[in-house]
Amino acid sequence: LSGLPAFYYPFKMLLARGCTIDLLLYSSEPKTVVESAHFRRENLIQIRPRHRGALGTLELPLHLAHATRQCLRARHYDFVYGMTEGSHMAVRTAAHMGIPCALRQFGTQEMANVLETIPSGWRRQLRALKDYTYITLSMRSRKNFLLATNDGSRADALYDILGVDRKKFAFYFWHSAVNIPAQQPIVDMDAQGSYPQVFQPLCLSHIGRIADVKRQDRSVRILGELHRRGYPFHLYLVGEKSSEAMYRACLDAAAEYGVADYVHMTGNQPQSVCRQYARNALATLLPGEWNRVNIFYEVMGEGCVVLTNNNHSVDEFIDRGNNCLVYDTEAEAAEQLIALLNDPQRAQRIRANAHRTAIEQFLTLEKRFGMEAQLVMDTASGRDTAHYPEII
């Protein structure tokens, strides 16, 4: 298993507690199932559609429900846990069969942003069912609990937007967690070599998929303001392109400022390389619509200089100017970066304070996903779960 910790770490913690897990793996695309140290072939049940294209995508949830029903009839299971809204049919099947079950919800931010622009009533409900079918259904169906990440997902606001009664299940809205080095990674400011392997003071990074909510175009504008002031920085946009509109906005901003040759789109990179891009830049930029996301936790934990826009999404963690840089306009952001470039000792202090903040305030992977694993186990065994916080 690979990907974000939220997708695999709960399984890791459950296995460490002695649980046995079978995985129902489903995709409308051709995939190969590979064994791992923890999951043998008999633990991996692959579900494929019978048809290709749109028809295969439509029939896949029905196959998932059928496979879930077959598994639950064939042997005893204590719990069914659906990862992402695509698992709705499996969780729904378990609920109908009286098996304790829950859903880990993802992908709600865009849905909330889109639906709140539509007048409440049947038009909003119809759009939700049409464009966000399984998120909408999963929010209305019975289960023991639903868990969403309190990182700008807006899953809490979505209930009010849709007018959904939460009483059909417990709703948990918890912060995410990342792997934070116990010791601050050392950056050699005098090392010789090429970025991102070594520090380059005239490099900036923006880590994350190119998407509307990430606002890479704002980073390009900051770069443009630096060039207008005579500082030839380079900007590295590290992440896959998931929005053609944002990709075009970046190109347009680069053309407007005449900095196209200084904007580098690297595509998707391994996590270790992403950390290099962040750590070995003068600063890593977070100018998104909402910045309390995994990458914020990760780059702070790496002891990076983070430059974020003043949208208050990370206010609870930052001491402005001491562990993070905050700006209101792109011109102000450029001025702050120039000042930082000319004060290496201050940059080192900000890096040290960022890492200290991460150690003292962020949830570790073990604590956060240990809580999730224990919640699953307590729910499966019928124990009282009233002591689990609804919001972290």
Model features per residue range: what roles?
Residues 81, 94-118, 125-127, 147, ...:
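Active-site proximal beta-strand in glycosyltransferases
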Residues 207, 234-249, 267:
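Glycosyltransferase donor-sugar binding loop
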Residues 344-381:
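A charged, aromatic-enriched C-terminal amphipathic alpha-helix characteristic of glycosyltransferases
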Residues 148, 192-214, 220-223, 236:
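Conserved donor-binding/catalytic core segment of Leloir-type glycosyltransferases
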Residues 1-32, 363, 392:
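N-terminal subdomain of nucleotide-sugar transferases
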Residues 128-170, 176-180:
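A short, active-site helix/loop in glycosyltransferases that binds the activated sugar's phosphate group
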Residues 276-291, 304:
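Acidic donor-binding loop of glycosyltransferase active sites
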Residues 248-268:
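Nucleotide-activated donor-binding/catalytic signature segment of Leloir-type glycosyltransferases, i.e.
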